[in-house]
Design a protein with these regions (language model features):
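Phosphate/dinucleotide-binding and metal-coordinating scaffold of catalytic cores
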Residues: 1-195
């Protein structure tokens, strides 16, 4: 089922691979239309509009996976490495559940900031915006460069599901397994244990 969806709609999946003609046509069409890059002042309203569109379509998330709904966007921000971002967002009501949801997005941002303080580990830049009663966690994509560049990426979920002898919820354990198979050097395995 996932492969069928990726073949039809996988134009902006993680990494550099695009599967199938339909997804490639969708990606090429998007590039020909030159998706607008949101200015710093337009970003909050742009994110709010994207969240509302996703909510009105009843889409719970994206092909990027995870428990929070999300979308990808292009935004201009001084000092950013790339305009490409993944944006997770909360709902916009005042319930306790939505408040916890918003708090978790903020905690994820703080965790990314904490990881960035470890000299030997690189982590994506992130920031939190609050607008229209929603919290938005914006994370720079490390698999994109410039407006059109795509870098290779294989998620840990994909590797575990297809290549590792067993799965783990522990990154350090997964790193040790990949090191034992010769896929990661000792430094990379140690970095995963640190995280």
């Amino acid at each position: 089922e996932v492969l069928v969806i990726l073949l039809k709609m996988g134009a902006d999946t993680s990494g550099n691979l695009i599967l199938g003609d339909s997804a490639l046509d969708l990606w090429l069409h998007g590039k020909a239309q030159q998706q607008a890059v949101l200015s710093e002042t337009d970003t909050p309203d742009g994110y709010l509009e994207c969240a509302q569109q996703i909510g009105s379509r009843g889409v719970a998330g994206s092909s990027a996976g995870g428990e929070f709904p999300k979308f990808t966007a292009l935004r201009a921000l001084a000092g950013a490495h790339t305009p490409h971002v993944i944006v997770k967002f909360s709902a916009n009501d005042r319930s306790d559940t939505v408040q916890r949801w918003s708090d978790l997005l903020i905690c994820e941002h703080l965790a990314l900031q904490a990881i960035r303080t470890i000299a030997t580990i690189q982590s994506a830049s992130s920031r939190v915006l609050q607008h229209g009663g929603r919290s938005f966690l914006e994370v720079e994509r490390f698999d994109r460069h410039g407006l059109f560049g795509r870098s290779p990426l294989c998620s840990l979920d994909t590797l575990e599901a297809s290549q590792l002898p067993s799965t783990s919820t522990d990154w350090g354990d997964a790193g040790d397994k990949m090191h034992a198979l010769g896929w990661l050097g000792p430094t990379a395995a140690a970095q995963l244990r640190t995280i």
